[in-house]
């Protein structure tokens, strides 16, 4: 056989649902790569003969290979920090109180409007490097810290540039409807008009976004405004998604499902009717335990209902300066299990196959299947559950992206 590389002495957590074993596991396995794709995988005993002198062979020393991790919800590009608000919350102020007093998202907006593209790029690069060291091979990056046309475009341009200069694939999301800027404080409908009539066309003209998101909440955008933005995005051919049911149950998830959204994110206050709507539409539920933890929330997402109705559950970092300043997907695996009571298998699926579904890229990445992109990680672990069980020592040994070895952890 003519391959570009072969990995032996490994176990595979394929996350392939057609394999009945937990994690889609194949033990004592091998995997071969050709032209950036997975060319063969299976038990080592069934590996076809190949020329070991001409093909690089990597020995995994009994470790586990998983699909590359996918962080499907981040706000990775921002300037400044909100440590002062952290102190205020510890003294009793709520997220909503801080936001209504001019803090929260608006304070980050001010910093991002003042920062230039070079500064934002360098900040984003450092954060993307941190995720990459934990085995992340695809990341979604939202705008939403500009709230004016110029700065929203600036953030999205930086995100696109990061994708061009980093081995991690970057999917971009336009989140102009993240908050109402101070200049539109008494005219939120006017700001929605600006998003639809000026911002969105400018984003599309530069091909800066793969999807559009809205923060549907009573401190941000109501259902009618949300539907206007998402409908305009859908009419323009962009994927849609929604921040919904984080602080209250406004029915945003049902709206998103009706419009065919790829995902609804946060969903702590999602009810059974909303879960059923997601199930019927095939919309993913993105769980964000970092924000739940950092904001010291108590209302948990309806995990049992999501299981009952077969809604794909996704885990993501929600990395941002205000509610989840946690740049770690491995910690999300642990939090998903300890805080939300996911099983380790559900948690890993939420950062691989289901995360790919939330971004509409599951045909190419998210599981180890012949013909899919060769994005995978070798972990120094005895069982896949160990990824969620233990935190603090990074077990990521090697990362392959598009068939190329891009990271070796010595």
Curated annotation (Swiss-Prot):
Residues annotated to bind Fe(3+): 73, 75, 243, 318
Family annotation (InterPro entries): Amidohydro-rel, HutI, Metal-dep_hydrolase_composite, Metal_Hydrolase
A biological process from GO: L-histidine catabolic process to glutamate and formamide
Pfam family of the protein (one): Amidohydro_1
Cofactor comment text: Binds 1 zinc or iron ion per subunit.
Chief place where the protein resides: cytoplasm
Gene3D superfamilies referenced in this protein's UniProt entry, alphabetically: Metal-dependent hydrolases (3.20.20.140), Urease, subunit C, domain 1 (2.30.40.10)
Pathway: Amino-acid degradation; L-histidine degradation into L-glutamate; N-formimidoyl-L-glutamate from L-histidine: step 3/3
Molecular function (Gene Ontology), one example: imidazolonepropionase activity
Binding-site residues, 4-imidazolone-5-propanoate: 82, 145, 178, 246, 323
EC number: 3.5.2.7
Catalytic activity: 4-imidazolone-5-propanoate + H2O = N-formimidoyl-L-glutamate
Protein known as: Imidazolonepropionase
Organism name: Shewanella baltica (strain OS223)
